[in-house]
Amino acid sequence: MTSFETPNNFEPLAFEQDQSRNIDNDPFTLTLDDVSKEANRNKYKIIPKELREQLWKLHFENQYTDLLELLEHIIPLCEDDFELFFLAGKSSANLELYQKAMMYFQKALYFRPDDYFVNFEIAKLFHQAELHELAEKTFEVCSHLEPANFEPVYGRAEALCMLKDYRGARPLLKRVVEIEPKFTRAYELLAVCYIQLAEFENAHNTLNYMISNSHTLGKAVGSSKNLKQLCHMHRLTTCMELGLFDEGRTSIQEAKKFVEKFSQNIALTSEARFQLALANLRLGQTKDAWGHYFHRFEQQDFPSPKRKFTRPRAENISELTGKTVLIWREQGVGDEIELCGLLQEFMLKSGATVILEIDERLVSGVTRSHKNIVVRAPEYDKETLYSAYHDFDYHMPMADILTFLKPNKSIKNCIAPWYKVDTEKAKNWDQKITSDSLRIGFAFGSHFKNAKRDKHKHLNFSLFEKLIKNSDHTWVNLDYTWTDLEFNAIDEDIKSKIFFPDIDLKNDFEQLAAVLTNCDLVVSPYMAVRSLAGALGIPTASFVRGAPYHFDFGASIENPDTFTSPLVPLSTVKQFGDQLETEEFEASLLKHFEVQIEKAEKLRGQ
């Protein structure tokens, strides 16, 4: 995201009155002493034109400190002068005195509430203060004041993106490029919106347009000199999601050139490195991926908090022999469960003693399962992000296990069910979930939703209704996203075939694991319950749309057949193209689940 420049069509009022004077050659000079003497002598309420021009001269020469000092002496004598308040606000803002700037702009607004420039400056202040809702509303006011100006429309779109309202930002960005077809940042942000809304084809087309016109767009004000390579960086996502692997390889080469050119500038290349890592992992090119993946936390907008420690971050596995390393959670609970399956292999290869900070919902189960590891919930200052503990030599975010082991598809030889369930709880659920046939656990959604997750990780219960209706099996509900309306709408015949465990399915992983261990098969989207089932050794049937995520190490992504997820034992994951229509997708997924149920039936009969 970028901050806004001063509107380039703003002209000071004094210059509008008289353009004939050459201020640079004007013998009139201004000092604080001059202002005080002149003020005391004349007691003016309307300052002389020469003085006004000299104030603007200081502004255009970026002499903000001197200018503000002068204005603070003049303003008490001219309290109804809009222009002075505006200049004081601009000077304060440029000196990063944001509260003072807001005070002056508000006073200017009192005299001219419909002035575009004052409203625009106030919107910029809200933007800089990360008060995105106020920024969006104020930019909206500006866009009404000057409908033909693209800057406030873009400002409003940017604020909405900061609020994660990509659907609201999308039409505004389209409007921006209609007004100003060469405004590169709008195309860039529009592509990001499309990606966040899982509209990958639209994003791909936008990026292709930018690449095709990079010679022209690259000359526009505010454009990056590396526009073409940056577009290819974003295009890695769309190519992988749309299955355009040949185009993806072209974008990989362009993004690599950018990273190599600026190899010493980690901050500049961090996002490109991350996209290169994911693309290579999705293509199964793990050798080229893990070095880039290590730098994921250098990204400005990386979603996981970058925690702070008094000990250094581990940079290679060889330095950990005989040392104590703190491994801390960085991603979702499903990823944590999967990575826990690599802990023993990591300890074997590194020779390190491990302290593991993990989601508090997993602490008891992981402690029972990995007795040679100290397991605890994270504890750190929520403002500074500094850890409360110092009992280790090195720290590392949890997915660094992957960057150190550098796994490929052969890693599945090191993976085995590892989660040890509470046996008493498991026996209790075995008695409660009665069935003469299969016990099939199912889930269809996650509580955390956005457009991308809805496409990749969310189903409607109606799909499971079709499976349950003609089934003689007992279906065990593992989903906690039911609404009362959805639950009450279930046909009673179907509801009679479903066992609803009376537990907190979202937070009580001890009870959830005990329920899962009594299932013959778990059917769900690509989510945490699937990961926990795999850690228990329960067969799972799942799916992905587009290219698999990086924890699958690119297994068979160029083949639409079923593949096995290496980190989840006995996991069957069906891959579907992103462009499948909903009906075609659901019909194919239904068939996939039916096949896995048939396999479970045969396994039970053996």
Where are these regions (language model features)?
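Alpha-helical solenoid repeat scaffolds of the TPR/TPR-like class and their adjacent stem/linker regions
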Residues: M1-L521, Y526-R530, G534-Q606
